[in-house]
Each structure stands twice: as C-alpha cells, then as structure tokens.
Amino acid sequence: MNYFDQIEELKKIIKANPNNFVNYFNLGNLYRKTNQLDLAIKIYQKCINKNKNNFQAYNNIANLYKEKKDINRSIDNFKLAIKINPNYHNAIYNLGSIYLNIKDYRNSYIYFINALKIVPNHIPTLNNLAVVMINTKKYNEGLKYLNQIIKIDKKFAPAYTNIGNIYWYKDEVEKCIINYKKSVDLNPLNINSYRNLLGAYEKSNQLNDYSEFLKLCKKKFPDNPIIILHEGILNFRNKNYKKTIENLEKISFDPKDLFEIKRNSFLAKSYDFINLPDSAFNYFTKTNDLSENSYDAKNYDKKKYINEVLKRKNYFIKENIDKWKKINYSKSNLNLVFLIGFPRSGTTLLDTILRSHPKIKIIEEKPLVTTMISKIKNKNLKNLENITNDEINFLRQEYQKEFEKYENPENKDIVYIDKLPLNIIYCGEILRIFPDAKFILSLRHPLDSVLSCFMQDFVLNNAMANFLRIDDATKLYENIFNLWNQ
C-alpha cells in the first residue's frame, strides 16, 4: 500500500474514531512524507488539540516550519516541545541547529550543551559544538570536541574537515592539509572535501600539488562549478589570464555565496592584467557590491571608523592642544618608530627594504597602539589634557606588554618599527604618550592609493569596509590626511 492509499485508510479510521490523537499523528507523518507540508502542520495541530502534551507533534511542526523557512515559528514550536519534555533530545538538538544556521552562536551553544548532557556522545552535537567554537574563534575548545568525536568514531569525516578548518584559520596550513586529506579519503564522493583541500593548496602556494589534485577533481566532478572555479584560479596563477576569463565567465554561484565573490574578484584581476580597464572596473565593482551585502559585512560598520577619524580631527586642534598640561617625561624604554600611511601606499615595500638592515626589526600589523589607547581614562581624548605621569607610565607599560609578545626590547642597538598603516590616525595619542616617537610616512599618489584600496581583497573590519565603494575610500583618504596635516 503506497502513502496515498495509507492516507485514505487513516482518514476513514479517524472518521470512525475522531478522538484518537495517535491516528492524527500518523496522518501528519504521511502528509509530511508526501510533501504536503501545510496539511501535515494542520493535522499535527489537530493531534495537539486531542493531546496537548504531545511534544513530538510540536517537534514535527517545528521541523516543517524549518523546511518552509519560517524560522520564528520553528523556534517557537521547538520551545513548546522542550517545555513539555525538558529532556527531549531531538527538539533540543534541533533548536541548537536552527540557532547555528542563523548564526546565533550564543543560543546554539546553550542548546547543544544541554543536548550533550542528555546524550553525552552524540556525534552530531559534538560536531556542531565544534562549529560554534570555530565561528567564535575558540579554536582549542573546538579541537577538544572534535578529538572527542574521533575517539568515538575515527572514520567520521566531518570531524577531520573541521579540524582542517581550525588549522586554516590558525594559518597552520600543513596541518590543515593533513586533515583535509583524511576527509577526502574517508568521504571520496563529497565535493566539499575536495573543495577544502583545493583551497588549502591554493592558499599555501603549493601549485604543483594544487595542479595534480585538480586533475583528479576534474575526473571525478568534471562539470562542477567549484572545480571550474579552481581551474580558473590555477590559470590565473600561471598568468594565463584569458583562460581564467574563459573558465570563470561560464559559471556562477548564488550572490550570497563567497565563491561568487571570489569568481568576480579573479575576473576583475584578469581583465586588469590584460589591460581591459572598463571590464576590470566593472568586476571590481561587482566584487565589492557582493562583499558589501555578504553576511560578514553585516558585522562591521564603516561609519564607526569614519567617526573615529572625525573625533580625532575635531579634538587635535591648536585650541585643545594649548590646554595640555606640561609634563616632565621620563625616558622611554623603547626607541620607537612608527611606519604609517594610507593602505596600499607602499608600506609593505618599505617594510621589506627596512627589515634587510641587521639593526632594524619590524613588528608587522599588530594592535599595539590600539590596545594602549583603549586604556586611556574613560577612552576620552579630553583626558589627554590633564594626564598624569603615572597614567602615562601605565599606558607605556600596556604598550610594552603587547610589544614583548613579539620582540625582546632589551637590545638598545636595535631600532624597532611598529608597522601598521592606519596607526596614522592615532599619532596625536602616540605623541602625548611617547613624545620622542618618530614616524615614517609612506606616500603614494592619492588616485593610485584610493583605486588600489578599492581593488584589494581586504579582510573586512570597520576600517576596510570603507574600501568597498570608491567614494567612501576617497572620503576616508581625505579625512585621514586632513587629520594628519592639521
């Protein structure tokens, strides 16, 4: 008897005995199996009307709303199931999964931990907890859950994938590759395992391995857009830009997919290299539009960084600086030089030249200055006016603590250069705390700097979000150098 025949039989049974909630529950299951989601919800609700403590019916309704992408109703019904039965593992796990899918990591963690208390060795829960830890950058915690999985089932491929992901984010690419290879071996039909390993080979510039593995991928998944994307990237790496364009213009991904950002970015750079600026600019614009609408971009606010610049522009004026209390500074333990400038202005080239000198050491792009100034009293620039020697010594110590994470300052013959271009906006604070500090300002033609920032694939933060639009990049340049020049 097929599902539709079973539905008709159950309808007859319900008509004869309309108060048996089990029959409604079973009918709801059949409607779900035949993809009649709205009818299934309606019948499960009738089941609940007959037995209001039927937590399984609430769980099934929640899953149906999840399928219908009605997340709020799904969450509400999972919570109703849990309220009736606080130890109902399925609903607790499912609710954790919903929160994970919508990137509510705090709530997903709470529900997965509760699920684990009920079924301690539930592998999907352990794996999802690891994903939560990865997304909240608690990598060691993530490894703990993944190693627990491997003790239970050493052939669970997603655990190795996620271990690889952790090492990817930690920039330990060789360990990343080892674990991605294990995932491929254990799950040879899963395109995602191959995709991850291709990405790791590309990131680590292991182009021979990248090329050889790509040949295998093309045999297994000849028409897969991800494989074609990597074929285009490899052609780009081999400077075959026209072939890259041919590869990448015949595929596309969902606009919310990071692969679509990557595809447009490589097309932009390829057109740039073959001197077709209009096409290049078009694809750079598309890349940035996609980035601006990505999930990651929602975590950042370009206006916050602009406001930080404007706040300093408004404060560091002669009228305010004239009010500063005179201080008898003690000699700093550090002989400090700051390498600053607008991004893409040549600071990396200067870094390469300077670090070739045996008596120069570069601390590259570390948050030494921002950590220090975050400790200024009440984070208020006006407190620089009457700052005390004790407060200055405290701030210097905070800087030195960060400094010593990367270099030992005991050798007085060494010149240490703190290189972070956008420290240019903190020069006022730096000079109030280290009046003997020196600055190397890297300058490039403004048009080149701004355009280069617009074309660059920066990791997004509040500052870098200003480079997704060329007019925002221009305004940022103008405001920063107005601050510098005043």
Question: Language-model segments: which ranges?
Answer:
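PAPS-dependent sulfotransferase catalytic domain
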Residues: K170, S204, N224, N238, ...
